[in-house]
Amino acid sequence: MATFEEVSVLGFEEFDKAVKEHEGKTIFAYFSGSKDTEGKSWCPDCVEAEPVIREGLKHVTEDCVFIYCQVGDKPYWKDPNNDFRQKLKITAVPTLLKYGTPQKLVESECCQSSLVEMIFSED
């Protein structure tokens, strides 16, 4: 059975560092609105998608790294010049992607278990 290592990061710089530390491995990245002190994201779609993503991780077919990235607070996220939008071309949260490939699920797609399972299980 395939396994994954989970890395939780906050912000673009930590995300970039985590990607570099795991170079050469298959990386899945999940981008979510940051959580408050009670562990709840400001992004309702992210709250809805997280359990679907967690369930989907059970379907990974290769050893990989799962980076859970909190993108920051809502005002930062809405800034069109933030690094996630500029450097990674991420336009919405939640977003799940297979790093370095065109495979990406955005917003409501992250709540569809069949799509989530597919992204984790495709070669």
Swiss-Prot record:
Pfam families in UniProt: TXD17-like_Trx (PF06110)
InterPro entries: Thioredoxin-like_sf, TXNDC17-like, TXNDC17_dom
Disulfide bonds: C43-C46
Domain Thioredoxin, residue spans: 41-123
Residues annotated as catalytic: C43 (nucleophile), C46 (nucleophile)
Record function comment: Disulfide reductase. May participate in various redox reactions through the reversible oxidation of its active center dithiol to a disulfide and catalyze dithiol-disulfide exchange reactions. Modulates TNF-alpha signaling and NF-kappa-B activation. Has peroxidase activity and may contribute to the elimination of cellular hydrogen peroxide.
Protein name per UniProt: Thioredoxin domain-containing protein 17
Organism name: Mus musculus
